[in-house]
């Protein structure tokens, strides 16, 4: 199985999350598994090159992957397609950076080997969702793309995890791209289009199963995980840890103490902002630049 990540830019937080996620899979990998990072910042993955393959892309590649409608997240589908072509005999498991393997990796490998697709949690049908997603659905409801007429049987799955069996990869990805481009051509709301395209393509061409709770997607509690990742990276750097020692450090983390979901009150956020404005830091001093 090829375990795939895609990162853009040089914001440290994204790459720290990717690092943690990669380690969570590395500890259960066998000789026929590989980790592939597709990134615009390959220099941030030099340390991981000891146990992961890094594929460098640039802004021109991303722009090409966005397609004629310049839809940024179409690049996710194209990145999966690119790696699938590099490793046509491998099942592909794409992951967002803010994911972590909690359960047994074989619970992911088995359905892929049986020809079933995988995605994160089933969110339900877009007709019952909030404003922008609902507007998207109203535009595309009943329309036909690549021989598929969109209906109430087509639920939306979170795309933080996308698993594609290798024998069906070409068909699934061609269908996902046709859905994505067709919806964009028809003027659908430019939100979660790639997510819905992958959901429908996998449902129709491979069948679809959820990966939660084998994989946790902590999109609503990132700060806790970023801090844990930074502390781990610091220990690895400061101790000059070998890959084996690094893995033991990761295994020593008590991940059960890190929340995978936190509801943050808007009122608390507004009050914190207000207090910050009323009681600003004073007498702030800096080291002077040398002339």
Briefly describe each language-model feature range:
Residues 1-66, 85-88, 261-264, 268-291:
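N-terminal anchoring/stem segment of glycosyltransferases
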Residues 16-19, 23, 74-78, 192-196, ...:
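A structural signal for well-ordered alpha-helical segments within the folded catalytic domains
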Residues 27-31, 82-93, 166-171:
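Secondary-structure boundary elements
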Residues 65-75:
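A short, glycine-/small-residue-rich helix N-cap motif at loop->alpha-helix starts
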Residues 77-128:
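GT-A fold catalytic core of metal-dependent nucleotide-sugar glycosyltransferases
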Residues 138-153:
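Short, flexible, basic/aromatic active-site loop/helix in glycosyltransferases
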Residues 149-240:
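Catalytic core and acceptor-binding pocket of nucleotide-sugar-dependent glycosyltransferases
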Residues 214-291:
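C-terminal catalytic/acceptor-binding lobe
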């Amino acid at each position: 199985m090829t375990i795939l990540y895609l990162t853009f830019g040089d914001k440290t937080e994204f790459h720290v999350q990717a690092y943690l996620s990669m380690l969570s899979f590395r500890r259960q990998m066998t000789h026929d598994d590989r980790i592939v990072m597709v990134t615009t910042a390959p220099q941030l993955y030099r340390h991981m090159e000891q146990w992961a393959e890094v594929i460098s892309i640039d802004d021109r590649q991303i722009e090409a992957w966005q397609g004629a409608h310049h839809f940024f997240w179409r690049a996710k589908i194209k990145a999966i397609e690119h790696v699938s072509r590099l490793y046509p005999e491998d099942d592909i498991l794409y992951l967002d950076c803010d994911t972590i393997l909690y359960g047994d990796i074989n619970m992911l490998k088995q359905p892929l080997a049986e020809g079933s697709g995988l995605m994160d949690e089933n969110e339900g049908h877009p007709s019952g969702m909030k404003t922008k997603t609902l507007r998207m659905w109203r535009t595309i409801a009943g329309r036909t793309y690549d021989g598929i007429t969109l209906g109430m049987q087509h639920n939306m799955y979170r795309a933080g995890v996308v698993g594609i069996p290798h024998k069906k990869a070409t068909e699934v990805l061609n269908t996902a791209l046709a859905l994505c481009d067709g919806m964009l051509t028809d003027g659908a709301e430019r939100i979660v289009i790639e997510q819905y395209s992958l959901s429908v393509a996998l449902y129709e061409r491979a069948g679809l199963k959820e990966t939660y709770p084998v994989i946790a997607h902590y999109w609503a509690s990132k700060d806790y995980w970023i801090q844990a990742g930074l502390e781990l990276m610091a220990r690895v750097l400061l101790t000059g840890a070998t890959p084996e020692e690094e893995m033991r450090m990761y295994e020593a983390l008590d991940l059960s103490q890190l929340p995978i979901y936190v509801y943050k009150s808007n009122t608390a956020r507004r009050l914190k902002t207000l207090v910050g404005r009323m009681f600003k830091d004073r007498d702030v001093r800096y080291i002077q630049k040398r002339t």
